[in-house]
């Protein structure tokens, strides 16, 4: 079966591709996984919802375990029979805080009359899709807000615990991906390649700083160097402190990033 467990069409369901980030779940046996933004790129992902899923793995070890995963309740971690609505959280901008154009603003996908109409659930709930943002990393702060690292800006996106956007998208000063709103509007030139934004993000053990790691080198920086920018969570601004990660070889790439303690 090339489609996995369920064959299309997917009535009231959505295929899910790879996981990009993970957080602790509601209990010690569950984890929260964030899916990648869509199915190939911004131009093919307008109806792909940006979601997190609660997953309960049964690790296979020397003493037992099946090595399988199952759905769990997002709020409690309790086992579920399938990945139904209680197992997931979907990002939304119902309060219109993001200050970016999103698919829910349009009648037709991509604001193109030749495309299908925007799904009513996306429209009504102002649900965020893979054409709006490319979230690759996520951290939960000490106030239970969530911070998402995006690649289209690159932007930092702040939501509450329910996935509702709390403020405008935060740009990284001086860095512009091709999809950044200022590049699209002709106000800036891109200096970061596509899919080069915040692939990895760590949070300090105190929960007061984020460290956002770019996936690609900014134009003009030494080849093979990736910027890590420090962000003050309480002040909601970049501190100006910047670090550099050196790739060992050109074909290497980074994934996620985790702080072990305050200085490492």
Indicate where each model-derived feature is located.
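Sequence/structural signature of beta-propeller domains
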Residues: 1-264
